[in-house]
Amino acid sequence: MTAKITIAALQEMKREGRKIVGVVAWDTPMAQIADRAGVDIVSVGDSVGKNLWGHATENEVTLDELLIVCQAVRRGAVRALVSCDIPSGSLSDAKRLVDEGGAQMVKVLAPAPAVRAIAAAGIPVFAEFHGGRPTAELVDEAKRLEEAGAALLDFRHSGPDAGAAVVKAVRIPVIGGLGGGPWLDGRMRMAHAAIGYGTQWLDSQAETYAHVGSIALGALSAYAEDVRAGRQIKGQRG
């Protein structure tokens, strides 16, 4: 196994021009698979509520629920660095995610003062901010977050021009989730979306790296046919 990923290792990757690979995962098996694939960051997102638990929005996920998810992912990700979202952005919640959840970094959508408070407590911060504004304004915000102590930036909806400008303006890695691109220091993608796992991909022509949902549907349909026909099911003895 290669060396454990650290904040310092991620920052060195930026200096050397090596792209950082991130995925969002919510359970131990997916974290284990991501680890074996060589992913650098496994992020536990509050997106678990809408994409895995069937909630209407991500706002229904509580901190206590995220703690359980973070613990599960941490058990699976041995090499990759594990980050976890903070629903509130508060220092007390950040401490719980680290102390109880096992997070090695916390991701927060909050202004520089909140980032500074968390970073000052010795907790690495993955600071999220969004595009759709003048490039100069985005560069200034990125610099403020870096100065406040952010270890990484998650720049959503960056666009190539603003994204490239922010990457050049700060020393810390700039990762792109939604609306990112190759102009950033790395990318973040939901593992379920990358492999096409979920009912939303069963009837979709969206491009993915696999169609695991369709494979699962076919496999479970075949299993149901075997049971109803009185045949021995695959993988079970006795």
Question: Can you annotate each of these PLM segments?
Answer:
Residues 2-238:
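Alpha/beta enzyme core
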